């Protein structure tokens, strides 16, 4: 036929829609596992783009990046290659809340991710605005783009970000867009609704970008990169960055707030005509939200570089949808921004998302077999949350095609597991953001032990090398051996020992003890007393794990006991029981259980509206 296309141009194993942080991981995983993968985007020049803050990581999110890395993802490596300022956060607090946050060169990051996609074997990156999902007999079999070109696949992964019927707001002015400068995807929303998916609207926003030469940095507080070597990836060599791209801190003031209040009448959120009806992110409010809801004299503004060679700076903390006139006036009341020039205005964007209760924990749709969802389309916010979902969706699409066991991460072993469990068990009523407070066992889910927790899964699915997995196993073995050894290293009472302890502000010994017991003291580190150990530990990674365990042993052991109970409930499979036959279930519980379709008793216990009495009835039914 004259218009017939070659088979290899039409047929793929996996199709990924969208090249944001979720789409990249969703496409690389199956391609690396040997499956022919197509990834479609409306803008080939914005692959892996950072449309909001030019940063990766932060509390909880930085740990997610580490988890992505050890499961075989790419985000950590590319961040290490393109970061221009990096800091370990919460160093004055316990290890559970420490996390890396890096400013990236967003242009270099995007180009590097594009190169990685285009150089990956089994992967095709192509322009395409997807308008329709192809479904037959309850199974997905492909997509159709805006040119009427159809592609066939065994699995489709939607990672559409803010593009589904995206609409931008600057004051009372509106524009249809996936983000500033990009086309929205309108047909795809209709296709999903026609299939039977429930869609709702969320909103988010981004601040102005301003010209570097118009900023007076002398009125701001400088924040340099860390002096210690840092890396997100377990496969990168930690490095100290040059201090030539600092971030800067300034503050709003009452003049700023007065201008914001004066212009609220023109706000699409607070004006007489409320153009935006949808809910925005609780943990990243707009500046007008802050001024209206919080009675404070000032708010922090972090002024962040967007790249090594970029003349644009990002104003973290000043997201707004106020009209342009309000934006320029309020910025010029802020110290250091008195003569600022706006390069790109701030805006809010409203977009469609699906109810994530329509998904299994594999991120496959309950409605259509082989159709997966990841990222903001599931009601989440954040690059890291998106990338984590994308990786899990990509792995599970591949596992399904290859006939292998799916990857379902537990709450007790990863932040990605918490994220997906919350989405698929509780749903969302606002853009979801990961927080350390969402973790029941956060002392077990640390920045420093992501590889110990998850390497077995990365290796099992085939995305991390054998040598790395064996290295992790060896580390685990050595941690146990060294802890037992330190329990037996004797420290006698002596003037030498007590002099060391007094200098460290620690209580002198009255009787002999073990080195292990000295290390339990919060004011003492191993390096302080290493001369008391005849077999000195020189491996920094090994030493870090040992010290954390010894100092927090009581808390860690208590959590491990709680995890055992948690996993007992998680192991009771209820996915195949007929809920209509379970006696004495409340009507609400029966409805919620049918909607969520929990995999286990443990998941059922976390569904809002399901009571302990309902759980007892299910257990009683199973035991009979």
From Swiss-Prot:
GO terms for biological process: tRNA methylation; tRNA wobble uridine modification. InterPro entries: FAD/NAD-bd_sf (IPR036188), GIDA_C_N (IPR049312), MnmG (IPR004416), MnmG-rel (IPR002218), MnmG-rel_CS (IPR020595), MnmG_C (IPR026904), MnmG_C_subdom (IPR047001), MnmG_C_subdom_sf (IPR044920). FAD binds at residues 18-23. Transmembrane segments: none annotated. Disulfide bonds: none annotated. NAD(+) binds at residues 280-294. GO terms for molecular function: flavin adenine dinucleotide binding. It comes from the Bacteria. The keyword Cytoplasm applies. PROSITE patterns: GIDA_1, GIDA_2. Keywords: Cytoplasm, FAD, Flavoprotein, NAD, tRNA processing. NAD-binding protein involved in the addition of a carboxymethylaminomethyl (cmnm) group at the wobble position (U34) of certain tRNAs, forming tRNA-cmnm(5)s(2)U34. Homodimer. Heterotetramer of two MnmE and two MnmG subunits. Belongs to the MnmG family. This is tRNA uridine 5-carboxymethylaminomethyl modification enzyme MnmG. The gene is mnmG.
